[in-house]
Swiss-Prot record:
It is a multi-pass membrane protein. It comes from Rhodobacter capsulatus (strain ATCC BAA-309 / NBRC 16581 / SB1003). It comes from the Bacteria. Part of a biotin transporter holocomplex composed of BioM, BioN and BioY. BioMN complexes can also be readily purified, but not BioMY nor BioNY complexes. BioY homodimers are also seen. Only the BioMNY complex has ATPase activity. This is Biotin transporter BioY. One of its GO terms (cellular component) is plasma membrane. Belongs to the BioY family. The keyword ATP-binding does not apply. Keywords: Cell inner membrane, Cell membrane, Membrane, Transmembrane, Transmembrane helix, Transport. The chain crosses the membrane at residues 8-28, 29-49, 51-71, 76-96, 115-135, 146-166. It is found in: Cell inner membrane. Central protein that confers the ability to take up biotin on E.coli; while biotin transport requires BioM at very low (pM) concentrations at higher (nM) concentrations expression of BioY alone suffices for uptake. InterPro entries: BioY.
Amino acid sequence: MERNVTLIGLFAALIVALGFVPAIPLGFGVPITLQSLGVMLAGAVLGSWRGALAVLLVQALVAIGLPVLAGGRGGLGIFVGPTAGFLIGWLPAAFVTGLIVERLRRVPVALAAGIGATLGGIIIMYALGILGFWLVKNAGLKPEDAPISLWAATAIMAPFIPGDLVKVVVTGLVARTIAQYRPSALLARG
C-alpha cells in the first residue's frame, strides 16, 4: 500500500515536472507539451488504476489553483478552456494505457506499452481533446471565437500527432527498460 502511494505521488510529480519543459504555443490555445508523455508513462508503468490515480492527483492540484501545467497554468478555468478536453482526457488515457499493458501479458512490454499509449494517449485523449476544443470554440465564451466544425477542430489538432507518436515510442522504450532492469517496478505487469 505504502509503495503504491509513493509511486502514484512520484508519477504525479513526473507529470508536473514535464510541465516545466517550455511549451510550444501554436497560436490557437493548445500548446505542445511533454505532460502527455507523463500520462502515458504513468499508465504503462503503474497500470490502469494507479496510473489514473497519479493523473487524478495532478488534476486535483490544477483544480485547486496550483500552477502545475505547462506554462505555469492552473485553476478551475483550465477546465473550461481550449485544453479542457485534453486535461480531462488524461484520466482515461492513463487508465486505458495501463489496462492494455496489463492485459497484453504475452506481448513484449515495449509493444504492449506502445499499443496502450496509442489507444489511450492518442486516440482517447484526442477524441476528448478535440471534442472539448470544439465545444469551447462553439460556446462563444470569447468574442474572437468564431464557431468551427468538428472536422475543422480535428484538422487543427493534426500538427500534434507526430510529436505524440514520438511520445508513444518513448513510452514503449522506457517500459521495456524498466522491465529489463527493474521488473518489480513495472506494476502494470506485476
